[in-house]
């Protein structure tokens, strides 16, 4: 069953055949690495951990929050498909929003723990 986004993409880019252009077995796409890169440029102590997280996430095929918790037991699962990751021993926090069907991750927030305490992680 296709949804409105799939139909609009197929209308713009017609294809023939029976394959699904939204392959749920393909690796996740992380949008946007530049946000992480800009952050680790200012906070070089977390560069390696953010690069590792990015590489792991970009190679993953997570289908649900339980799969993320298996790999990241300290991650916090929030409503609306948001996940909070502790970075560098909880000195930094990374919030993502994930669409499991389309295998896409959006970076919603990266900041210090003090900055994280000032935001609403469920709404950012």
Model regions: which residues?
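Basic, Lys/Arg-enriched alpha-helical interface segments
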Residues: 2-91, 99-104, 113-124
């Amino acid at each position: 069953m296709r949804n409105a986004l799939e139909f609009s993409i197929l209308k713009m880019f017609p294809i023939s055949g029976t394959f699904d252009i939204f392959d749920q077995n393909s690796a996740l796409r992380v949008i946007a690495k530049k946000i992480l890169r800009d952050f680790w440029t200012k906070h070089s102590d977390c560069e390696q951990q953010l690069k590792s997280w990015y590489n792991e996430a970009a190679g993953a095929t997570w289908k649900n929050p339980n799969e993320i918790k298996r790999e990241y037991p300290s991650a916090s699962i929030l409503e609306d498909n948001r996940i909070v990751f502790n970075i560098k021993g909880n000195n930094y926090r990374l919030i993502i929003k994930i669409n499991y069907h389309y295998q896409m991750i959006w970076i919603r927030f990266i900041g210090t723990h003090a900055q994280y305490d000032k935001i609403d992680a469920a709404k950012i």
